[in-house]
Every structure is written in C-alpha cells, then in structure tokens.
Regions:
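Long, contiguous internal "core" modules enriched in hydrophobic/ aromatic residues
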Residues: 117-150, 156
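Conserved small/polar residues in nucleotide/adenosyl-binding loops
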Residues: 2-10, 183-187
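P-loop potassium selectivity filter motif centered on the GYG triad
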Residues: 26-80, 143-185
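Membrane-helix interfacial "entry" motifs
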Residues: 8, 12, 66-73, 110-122, ...
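Transmembrane alpha-helical segments in integral membrane proteins
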Residues: 76-98, 185
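Hydrophobic core segments of alpha-helical transmembrane domains in multi-pass membrane transport
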Residues: 1, 24-28, 88-91, 133-142, ...
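Juxtamembrane inter-helical linkers in multi-pass membrane proteins
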Residues: 98-119, 155-165
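Alpha-helical transmembrane segments and their helix-start/interface "positive-inside/aromatic belt" motifs
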Residues: 8-21, 120-132
Length: 187
C-alpha cells in the first residue's frame, strides 16, 4: 500500500541519518583518543566531513600529522564515497528493511526505476569500478613522482571527490605539471 511505502521510505531516511552519525562518532575516535584533534566537536566535524566527502577541514598543519592519522583521514573519504550507502544496503535486509528504501533516501532525483533488479549485484559492480579507478589513479600518481603513501591517500580522496590531502598545499606541493594534468584533465 502507499502508506506502507511511505513508512518504509521514512525508515530508510532515519536509518541513513543514524548510520551517518554513528559512523562519525566511531570514526572520530582515532583523532580524539590520539590527541590529534583534542576537541570532540572538531574531531566529529573532521570525521563527518570525511565520510560525507565534503572536504572541509579544521586542520591547519596537516603535514605534522602521523601517517596513520592521514591514512585514516583519507580512508574516511574513500569509504564515504560509496561505502556507507552500500554497507547499509547490504546490512539492512538482515534487520528487515530493504536496501531500496535506503537507496531512495541517499539517491537524488527520481527513484521510480530500479538501478538493477538486484541492488546487491549493482553495488558489487559499482564497488569494482570504484576500486579500479582508485587503483589506476594510485599507479598514475606514483608514476608522476608521488610517494606510494601520498598516492594512496590522494587516490582515495580524489576518487571519492572529497579532496583531502596529505600536504597543506595539496597537489600544488608537488610542482608537477603531470600531476596537475591528472587532476584537471576532463574525464
């Protein structure tokens, strides 16, 4: 019935909202417990910015952070690029809420047509493409002179369109026309 569909869609919105807050509360722990971001609100903001691929940051001396924190920061954006949506789609059926309701809560625009008859298969295809794009960019950045660590972090944040960097000056730090071309060339 129509009322049942609205109720399920509302459930999807609530579950997505709770998932974002929950992931961010747990995701802020490395920053806060490690003392790298001593304010709870700042640590939460940095994490929410990562998981939402927003790219806003409260950090003003990025290069002073240890590699583990920089990797976690990049990973939050990579996970946020697609991960939370598809994790939720894969896990929610266990709790009796279908993945389509959650997809509708996250998707913009009309959602009358299904992406694929089986959302799980679609999610696997999208994850494969996402991982492939990330891997390709890692190789291209290493080829351009970035360290493996910086290449991984930048590929994570670029693929997700979040834009966090391991350097205060972002890609300008490298003074590389090749790297700039990778970031500015049309797809």
């Amino acid at each position: 019935s129509a009322a049942s569909d609205v109720y399920k869609r509302q459930d999807g919105y609530v579950i997505v909202s709770v998932a974002w807050v929950t992931f961010s509360l747990f995701g802020m722990l490395p920053y806060y417990i490690g003392g790298y971001i001593p304010s709870v609100t700042d640590a939460f903001f940095e994490t929410m910015s990562g998981f939402s691929s927003t790219g806003a940051t409260i950090l003003n001396n990025i290069e002073s952070m240890p590699h583990g924190i920089l990797f976690w920061r990049a990973m939050t954006q990579w996970i946020g690029g697609l991960g939370i949506v598809f994790f939720t789609i894969a896990v929610l059926p266990i709790f009796g809420v279908g993945g389509i309701q959650v997809f509708a809560a996250e998707a913009s625009g009309p959602t009358h047509d299904k992406v694929h008859p089986r959302i799980g298969i679609t999610a696997k295809w999208i994850w494969g493409i996402y991982a492939g794009m990330t891997g390709t960019l890692i190789v291209l950045l290493v080829f351009g002179g970035m360290s493996v660590f910086d290449s991984i972090c930048h590929a994570f944040t670029t693929t997700s369109t979040g834009g966090f960097s391991t350097k205060q000056a972002s890609i300008e730090y490298y003074h590389s026309p090749y790297i700039c071309l990778l970031y500015t060339s049309p797809s």
